[in-house]
């Protein structure tokens, strides 16, 4: 019940008074709207710490989003998965239209709640043009952070069977492959390219959509060519990004192991900036 959840949080905070924000990792925090609305009201009155949580688009209302902001939500996580409506309906069984997603995102932008989206790249029958729709939808809803994940066909799931019947699952052990599916219309280097440069292009399409219409259309077409053009050096760009990621990870490991206090301080500054950004 909401009462028990609040009691648990109070007990936790009494034992750990240094906690400055809370990240609710419930898979779908607003699955039961009545429960969620009551919890938010109690959380605002009795806890009031900045917080984040996982949210579904199709069971939200503007009033709930406003309550979330008032209660201390500064970021929400949501599964966008694919920007191609047909892919969402046919393969993911997520019956959320583009219009529904865009309208909900307007509420988060209106009340100053940052958006983090989870996205899937390399779904069966996807190609780079459909993947680009995912980038563009993130730009249209003004996602603040994005997490692109490469699709993995878990045995026993409908998408595994679809992939197997289509011949996209290679023979032998595919678990160590960076891109598990082998699809002629969406080769490995293109999947890795989209994953690596996902947020880079989301930011640039945001610029395009913020420009005057005519100029924005020209810039958008230029960006389209940079993503899907026949002369894009996908393999080289993936190799370059891999080197950059390796260097960044080495620096992170160094800070964690040699300068842990500095690392924790930097993490806290990062979270506080995100919270302040949405105030």
Label every PLM stretch briefly.
Residues 158, 175-279:
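Radical SAM enzyme core and accessory elements
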Residues 158-172:
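Aromatic- and acidic-residue-enriched segments that line the glycan-binding/catalytic groove
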Residues 36, 131, 160-161:
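Histidine/acidic-residue-rich catalytic or RNA/ligand-binding cores of hydrolases
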Residues 64-66, 124-140:
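Catalytic cores of alpha/beta
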Residues 1-118, 136:
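Radical SAM [4Fe-4S] cluster-binding motif and immediate context
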Residues 56, 83-92, 105-130, 149-155, ...:
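Conserved strand-turn element in the central/C-terminal portion of the radical SAM core barrel
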């Amino acid at each position: 019940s909401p009462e028990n959840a609040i009691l648990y949080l109070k007990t936790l905070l009494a034992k750990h008074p240094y906690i400055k924000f809370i990240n609710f990792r419930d898979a779908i925090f607003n699955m039961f709207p009545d429960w969620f609305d009551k919890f938010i009201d109690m959380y605002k009155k009795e806890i009031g710490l900045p917080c984040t949580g996982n949210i579904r688009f199709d069971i939200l209302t503007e009033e709930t989003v406003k309550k979330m902001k008032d209660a201390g939500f500064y970021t929400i996580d949501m599964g966008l998965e694919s920007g191609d409506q047909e892919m969402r309906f046919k393969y993911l069984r997520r019956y959320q239209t583009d219009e529904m997603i865009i309208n909900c995102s307007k509420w988060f932008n209106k009340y100053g709640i940052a958006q983090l989206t989870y996205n899937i790249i390399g779904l069966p029958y996807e190609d780079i043009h459909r993947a680009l729709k995912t980038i563009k939808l993130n730009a249209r809803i003004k996602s603040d952070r994005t997490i692109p994940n490469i699709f993995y066909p878990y045995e026993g799931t409908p998408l595994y069977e679809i992939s197997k019947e289509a011949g996209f699952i290679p023979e032998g052990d595919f678990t160590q492959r960076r891109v598990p599916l082998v699809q002629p219309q969406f080769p490995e280097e293109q999947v890795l390219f989209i994953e690596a440069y996902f947020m880079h292009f989301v930011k640039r399409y945001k610029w395009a959509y913020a420009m005057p219409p005519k100029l924005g259309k020209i810039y958008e077409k230029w960006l389209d060519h940079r993503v899907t053009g026949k002369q894009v050096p996908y393999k080289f760009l993936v190799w370059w990004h891999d080197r950059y990621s390796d260097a960044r990870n080495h620096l992170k490991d160094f800070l964690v192991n040699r300068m842990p206090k500095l690392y924790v301080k930097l993490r806290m500054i990062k979270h506080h900036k995100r919270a302040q950004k949405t105030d």
